[in-house]
């Protein structure tokens, strides 16, 4: 399929590294790209602020993408966060639970996000739902697995009589390869934007800017982001091969 053959996409956009790369990926391929974010009672408001910063800087630094960047939607689903509590929505330690999952796992989060995104996409006339889910460097979250997303895609299409596609460009990439994809899509300018503006840290830390971005440097999200950056940097900062 040639670039930008399909017309519109809706990116599930948190303002983190992965969804920021997915936004750039979609902007390279679609004529119109809208974004959707979810207020589900996250402990740190910085996540919602980062979304706007990334969108603003993408439009400012990449004029070729600015004309394709469409409307942003923010959906209030805090009632879901109150039910599906985790270390991301409540003041809890980040640790492994008895189920073998990190306490940062929000049960059903991606399933809920995709349901809301599909309902929005239906209204907006969009078939492609783009998300940053990944099996390679993920934290064991079952709703990041491709088989989960395939089942969700089938359920949405059956239940809404549509032909949605859940696209996951990072699914089989390591974090180092995700940095390489950033370089491929937008050069060092996009890498710098993601370092400076995106937010990953579970602790909401924005005070210190490391080579790989803002963050506490000790939570699992920061450690994974730093590890990927260091591996990519030491390997020569190459763009991901197409």
From Swiss-Prot:
Pathway: Purine metabolism; 7-cyano-7-deazaguanine biosynthesis. Catalyzes the ATP-dependent conversion of 7-carboxy-7-deazaguanine (CDG) to 7-cyano-7-deazaguanine (preQ(0)). SUPFAM superfamilies: Adenine nucleotide alpha hydrolases-like. It comes from the Bacteria. It is an enzyme of class 6 (ligase). Its cofactor is Zn(2+). Belongs to the QueC family. It holds the Pfam family QueC. Binds 1 zinc ion per subunit. ATP binds at residues 13-23. It catalyses: 7-carboxy-7-deazaguanine + NH4(+) + ATP = 7-cyano-7-deazaguanine + ADP + phosphate + H2O + H(+). GO terms for biological process: queuosine biosynthetic process. NCBIfam families: 7-cyano-7-deazaguanine synthase QueC. PANTHER family: 7-CYANO-7-DEAZAGUANINE SYNTHASE (PTHR42914:SF1). This is 7-cyano-7-deazaguanine synthase. Its EC number is 6.3.4.20. One of its GO terms (molecular function) is ligase activity, forming carbon-nitrogen bonds.
